[in-house]
From Swiss-Prot:
Species the sequence originates in: Aegilops tauschii (Tausch's goatgrass)
A GO CC annotation given for this chain: DNA-directed RNA polymerase complex
Cell location: Plastid, Chloroplast
Subunit structure: In plastids the minimal PEP RNA polymerase catalytic core is composed of four subunits: alpha, beta, beta', and beta''. When a (nuclear-encoded) sigma factor is associated with the core the holoenzyme is formed, which can initiate transcription.
Domain notes: The N-terminal domain is essential for RNAP assembly and basal transcription, whereas the C-terminal domain is involved in interaction with transcriptional regulators and with upstream promoter elements.
GO BP terms in the entry: DNA-templated transcription
Family: Belongs to the RNA polymerase alpha chain family.
Protein name: DNA-directed RNA polymerase subunit alpha
Top-rank lineage group of the source organism: Eukaryota
Main localization category: plastid
Assigned EC number: 2.7.7.6
Annotated spans, Alpha N-terminal domain (alpha-NTD): 1-233
Catalysis: reaction(s): RNA(n) + a ribonucleoside 5'-triphosphate = RNA(n+1) + diphosphate
């Protein structure tokens, strides 16, 4: 059936989700095809996407737990079936869904006897638990049990040195890897000069995002990696010239908005969405979290407003500046702005 759909190598490159299912709350599966590809291209794309999916997708997890006066992680607490180490391992397995950046606080505070599950975690509004039935501990006696938690969004596997903290807090090895597994296979079709390849890509995720969302994020990350090479020829500058390249100082978006409103061309700012501005995935996500969706939303913010956004850096500010400079009319760029 696939061979009939891909008749020749001259056909436009297309992708399609051919299978999608939810095996459990913490196991999503998706199967995608990309075709038609020339010989060797399927392997190139498959390797790049697999690496990006397994190592470049961001995830949210619990990174620290504070128990109070507990001497070490191998201690046992009266009235609790599990040891501190077992509780830490259970917390490590909790799957969270969120777009937050930076560190956030959470907590558990319950009274026994009862089972403690992920549903008992008190989270900030921006964080959601994927599987509320995940076990944490079993209180066998009528005791008060409270834990302070730290939550962080990151990528990859982060480990911390084990040491005793005076305040009773213990680090949890963070596994910020929403994609559990990726497989790809290649099928050759056609004859002679019309021979081409079809890439099949299988993605399993932990439920914090769908395979389609993971594929989208991995693709954006790969595009961001190659953007500097695309812009190098446009800039027409050598490496020596780049050393002394001017970095714009602090600027005020409000002034630029005023200049835009005076522009005779009447640009429909509310019709230009930020995903049309070729922003990096990091800058794009920062703006989306701040409910900035259009160019009008962006230019309505002062620089102070932007710098207050979680994880918004000076590099993001410069990237936005360069993007606006690229997309705004030339006559507007000649206007004097307040710095």
């Amino acid at each position: 059936m696939v061979r009939e759909e891909v008749a020749g190598s001259t056909q436009t490159l297309q992708w399609k989700c051919v299978e999608s299912r939810v095996d459990s709350k913490r196991l999503y599966y998706g199967r995608f095809i990309l075709s038609p590809l020339r010989k060797g291209q399927a392997d190139t794309v498959g390797i790049a996407l697999r690496r990006a999916l397994l190592g470049e997708i961001e995830g949210t997890c619990i990174t620290r737990a504070k128990f109070g006066s507990v001497p070490h992680e191998y201690s046992t607490i009266a009235g609790i079936e599990e040891s501190v180490q077992e509780i830490l391992l259970n917390l490590k397995e909790i799957v969270l869904r969120s777009n937050l950046y930076g560190v956030r606080d959470a907590s558990i505070c319950v009274k026994g006897p009862r089972y403690i599950t992920a549903q008992d975690i008190i989270l900030p509004p921006s964080v959601e638990i994927v599987d509320t039935a995940q076990p944490i501990a079993n209180l066998t006696e009528p005791i008060d049990f409270c834990i302070d938690l730290q939550i962080k969004r990151d990528r990859g596997y982060q480990t911390e040195l084990r040491k005793n903290y005076q305040d009773g807090s213990y680090p949890i090895d963070a596994v910020s890897m929403p994609v559990r597994n990726v497989n790809y296979s290649i099928f050759s079709c056609g004859n002679g000069n019309e021979k081409h390849e079809i890439l099949f890509l299988e993605i399993w995720t932990n439920g914090s995002l769908t395979p389609k969302e993971a594929l989208y994020e991995a693709s954006r990350n790969l595009i961001d990696l190659f953007l500097p090479f695309l812009h190098a020829e446009e800039e027409g500058t050598s490496f020596e010239e780049n050393k002394n390249r001017f970095t714009p100082p602090l600027f005020t978006f409000q002034k630029r908005l005023t200049n835009l409103k005076k522009n005779k061309k009447g640009i429909p700012l509310n019709s230009i969405f930020i995903d049309q501005l070729e922003l990096t995935s990091r800058t794009y996500n920062c703006l989306k979290r701040a409910n900035i969706h259009t160019l009008l939303d962006l230019l309505s913010k002062t620089e102070e407003d932007l710098l207050r956004i979680d994880s918004f850096r000076m590099e993001d500010r410069k990237h936005i500046w360069d993007t606006l400079e690229k997309h705004l009319p030339i006559d507007l760029l000649k206007n004097k702005l307040s710095f």
